Amino acid sequence: MAINLQKPDITELKPRITVFGVGGGGGNAVNNMITAGLQGVDFVVANTDAQALTMTKAERIIQMGVAVTEGLGAGSQPEVGRAAAEECIDEIIDHLQGTHMCFVTAGMGGGTGTGAAPIVAQAARNKGILTVGVVTKPFHFEGGRRMRIADQGISDLQKSVDTLIVIPNQNLFRIANDKTTFADAFAMADQVLYSGVACITDLMVKEGLINLDFADVRSVMREMGRAMMGTGEASGEGRAMAAAEAAIANPLLDETSMKGAQGLLISITGGRDLTLFEVDEAATRIREEVDPDANIILGATFDEELEGLIRVSVVATGIDRTAAEVAGRSADFRPVAPKPIVRPSAAVPAQPQPTVSLQPVPQPQPVQQPLQQQNVDHIALAIREAEMERELDIAARAQVAAPAPQPQPHLQEEAFRPQSKLFAGVAPTEAAPVMRPAQPAPRPVEMQAPVQPQMQAQPVQQEPTQVVRQQAEPVRMPKVEDFPPVVKAEMDYRTQPAPAHQEERGPMGLLNRITSSLGLREREATNVSSDMTAAAPSAASQQRRPLSPEASLYAPRRGQLDDHGRAAPQMRSHEDDQLEIPAFLRRQSS
């Protein structure tokens, strides 16, 4: 019986770091890092330009936007680069499988790097991968439009990465001279990315007295915002201090400073001659630049190739975190503070004004409020006036017995003052038709009442006495004694002479009738003259009274009197005489 013994497969557990180059600038950075011999890192290049992919040194490439760009590039349009990345998002995720840390590098200002880099970074971050962005900004001679596109791309990328490092190409002039070639200048910019990645990989892979694991690196770089990377080398006396100063003052970074950094990763590498005092001197100098409460992680490793040299690498994160939090709080506080102050102040003065004007008149409030709100709507105003006329008719009748007159009720009584005179000589049945034509008169008064309630209150208070005097006249009805003296004389004449005249008619002869008729004429003439003399003073006093046109129209008619107050029965008595005297006797008398 054979026994098969096999060696168990041991899965090597180590952090996997991927450098993802996007666009032309990212592909060039990857080529420079591969040429420098960076070990322990996987390289992936993605681009929309098929020709650029043929010149890359990376083994894993992604042709983005085959259907969108057909391999011709994005044409400096970030929208095209974004669409190309979204088209092959599944392939991007496959290349990120099993990655623990991803460096997304690109050149901002173009089409593919500016548009596709945020998509790649967001895909990596969604998988829980620690994502670090390292991008470059264009030169000033490339134009303002390209710079604005780059700034917008950096703003979008910062939302998708944990830590972002920005390297302006314009800063290359600080370290370049007239002999520096164009390719060498870009290689210097790529050295920043190379030193940062090498710093992290050396701490986790190479042998050393103070080794670091990937969890330490993740705690320093997770969601830290803007960051800076720097590396310095020195030899001879004071090499530790010189290397630390060179690492702190990196001339290629985007005007950043380590002041106030929340996370700090320090890597000190040297040969076997590295001393304890040199490590302390370098670490102390770097620690002075950051926040006292910053999370500082220090690692020291040995490299046989660095005999007589010391290399100090620094990764400072959370540089703008404190400033951003303070600015965000202040920005949130400023717009919110004035809002609750402005709204109550604008609403407080508007509320007491309508309440004060409406409190003294509780009943007409529903009538006044629609007039103020519907001044422009003439149709609604006419409807409201018709409703007011109906209410005024009811209010005029109900306010006769009201104990305490108010400003608005007085306005209604004043409007009906010319109508109150008509009740002196007109029956109650005639009051209704008289009030209807007089109602349009108070319309302008009612329209002005809600606009200026205070100005109308003064004349209204002077009217109550006049209204009471005018309403007292209808109580006294006309009697017989109020008739003119001419009418009284006529009434007396009808009562007294009638029986005497009837007594003489029966047995009277023809001659007596003639004489009696002549005497009757003389008596009537004397009576009329006496009545005229008696009625003269009374008629004069009657004419002195100011009679209104309404009273003259509705005064009792004098159907039996003429314009001079003479009695109409004279004509009747004369006619009676003409009827009583025969025709032949009338001829004889003539």
UniProtKB/Swiss-Prot annotation:
InterPro entries for this protein: Cell_div_FtsZ, Cell_div_FtsZ_C, Cell_div_FtsZ_CS, FtsZ/CetZ, FtsZ_C, Tub_FtsZ_C, Tubulin/FtsZ-like_C, Tubulin/FtsZ_2-layer-sand-dom
Basic and acidic residues composition-biased segments: 559-576
Pfam family, one: FtsZ_C
UniProt-listed GO biological process terms: division septum assembly; FtsZ-dependent cytokinesis; protein polymerization
Binding-site residues for GTP, renumbered to this chain: 24-28, 111-113, 142, 146, 190
GO cellular component term, pick one: cytoplasm
Record's keyword terms, sorted: Cell cycle, Cell division, Cytoplasm, GTP-binding, Nucleotide-binding, Septation
Principal location: cytoplasm
GO molecular function: GTP binding; GTPase activity
Annotated region described as Disordered, given as residue ranges: 346-372, 524-590
Cellular location(s): Cytoplasm
Family the UniProt entry places it in: Belongs to the FtsZ family.
Subunit structure: Homodimer. Polymerizes to form a dynamic ring structure in a strictly GTP-dependent manner. Interacts directly with several other division proteins.
Job description of the protein: Essential cell division protein that forms a contractile ring structure (Z ring) at the future cell division site. The regulation of the ring assembly controls the timing and the location of cell division. One of the functions of the FtsZ ring is to recruit other cell division proteins to the septum to produce a new cell wall between the dividing cells. Binds GTP and shows GTPase activity.
PANTHER family the UniProt entry points to: CELL DIVISION PROTEIN FTSZ-RELATED, MITOCHONDRIAL DIVISION PROTEIN FSZA
Name listed for the protein in its UniProt record: Cell division protein FtsZ 1
Organism encoding this protein: Rhizobium meliloti (strain 1021) (Ensifer meliloti)
